């Protein structure tokens, strides 16, 4: 699916991560059982070093409120002027009601501000931006997009294959109506591979072997039960390496934007080696493809792209391509124009006493 919008702009982005910081080197004994070779390999190939993890009492709404309040104050936005609050997450505070409605209360928003969730993972920022642009194209004026996860809650802390890979973080993005600003999106999904990245148990469906295409996800281990995240890492890597470059080429062709006019190509930061492989396949310049979020924050799911935008030293006006791939399986790319983008250094959330 490809589409174009011309009425919306991204005015600002803030990202909040929890205060508990973990360094992978400190987990040599507790997580890696003194397997120094595996630890060094994960650091080198995936690009891991540090990550931030929520405690049991910190959820998406807490980080989202922190990021949102900082963003709205920084942009001097009246909360009553917001038309919609969208929360994109796969780790909601509650099954019911939506995290957006709960956050609506925490932010003390007007009853005229509609609030709803979108269930998306690593590609979620693109899906959230797509919906926000659609709503503004139809007449809305200001939309607050909250995007991110606390996936560490679904992973046993001693699972050395997954625990070091995922960090927690939530972004807040303000999208506003403007006179003219082109934005191009390309999105896709393939549900045949729904079980390649999945939490089998915990919702309404009872997990049974005949539901899944992948028999191995029903095989539990000491540090992975059915309530924990399962990832077929090899297949996810291969499919991402196929889908993201294809999506990137399609969005460039659809937008008719010359690659030379794009300042940054931002790929979901799930694996430093994967980003390097995509960059090489597409023959992109190193200085246009930042690849450092894994080292500082690990895989932030839907929050990785907004984190990149906050961490980059961007000019006053620039074009960027954004691409992501994740659970669903779902993926997408966009070519966006930015002007006077408001960002702050990554915020550290401290639990209110």
From Swiss-Prot:
Where does the protein end up? Cytoplasm
Please provide the record's keywords in A-Z order: Acyltransferase, Cytoplasm, Fatty acid biosynthesis, Fatty acid metabolism, Lipid biosynthesis, Lipid metabolism, Multifunctional enzyme, Transferase
- The disulfide bonds in this chain are none
- Extract the signal peptide range: none
Q: Which GO terms describe its biological process?
A: fatty acid biosynthetic process; secondary metabolite biosynthetic process
**E.C. number, please?**
2.3.1.180
Known partners and oligomeric status: Homodimer.
Its recorded name reads: Putative 3-oxoacyl-[acyl-carrier-protein] synthase 3
This protein's species is Campylobacter jejuni subsp. jejuni serotype O:2 (strain ATCC 700819 / NCTC 11168)
Lineage, top ranks: Bacteria, Pseudomonadati, Campylobacterota, Epsilonproteobacteria, Campylobacterales
């Amino acid at each position: 699916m490809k589409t174009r919008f011309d009425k919306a702009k991204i005015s600002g982005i803030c990202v909040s991560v929890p205060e508990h910081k973990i360094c992978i080197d400190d987990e040599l004994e507790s997580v890696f059982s003194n397997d120094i070779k595996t630890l060094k390999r994960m650091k080198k190939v995936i690009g891991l070093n540090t990550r931030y993890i929520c405690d049991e009492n910190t959820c998406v709404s807490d980080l989202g409120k922190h990021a949102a309040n900082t963003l709205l104050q920084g942009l001097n936005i009246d909360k009553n002027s917001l038309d919609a609050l969208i929360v994109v997450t796969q780790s909601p505070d509650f099954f019911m009601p939506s995290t957006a409605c709960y956050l609506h209360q925490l932010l003390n928003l007007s009853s005229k501000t509609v609030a709803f969730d979108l269930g998306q993972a690593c590609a979620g920022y693109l899906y959230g931006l797509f919906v926000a642009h659609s709503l503004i194209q139809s007449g809305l004026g200001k939309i607050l997009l909250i995007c991110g996860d606390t996936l560490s809650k679904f992973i046993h802390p001693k699972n050395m294959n997954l625990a070091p890979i995922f960090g927690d973080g939530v972004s807040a993005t303000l999208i506003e109506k403007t006179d003219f600003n082109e934005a191009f999106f390309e999105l896709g999904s393939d549900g045949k591979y729904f079980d390649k990245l999945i939490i089998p148990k915990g919702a309404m469906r009872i997990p049974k072997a005949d539901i899944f295409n992948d028999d191995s996800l029903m095989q539990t281990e000491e540090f992975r039960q059915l309530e924990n995240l399962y990832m077929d890492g090899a297949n996810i890597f291969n499919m991402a390496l196929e889908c993201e470059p294809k999506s990137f080429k399609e969005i460039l062709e659809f937008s008719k934007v010359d690659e030379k006019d794009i300042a940054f190509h931002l790929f979901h930061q799930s694996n430093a080696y994967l980003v390097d492989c995509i960059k090489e396949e597409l023959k992109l310049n190193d200085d246009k493809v930042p690849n450092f979020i894994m080292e500082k924050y690990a895989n932030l799911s839907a929050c990785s792209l907004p984190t990149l935008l906050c961490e980059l030293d961007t000019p006053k006006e620039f074009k960027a391509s954004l691409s992501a791939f994740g659970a669903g399986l779902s993926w997408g790319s966009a070519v966006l124009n930015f002007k006077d983008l408001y960002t702050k250094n990554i915020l550290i959330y401290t639990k209110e006493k």
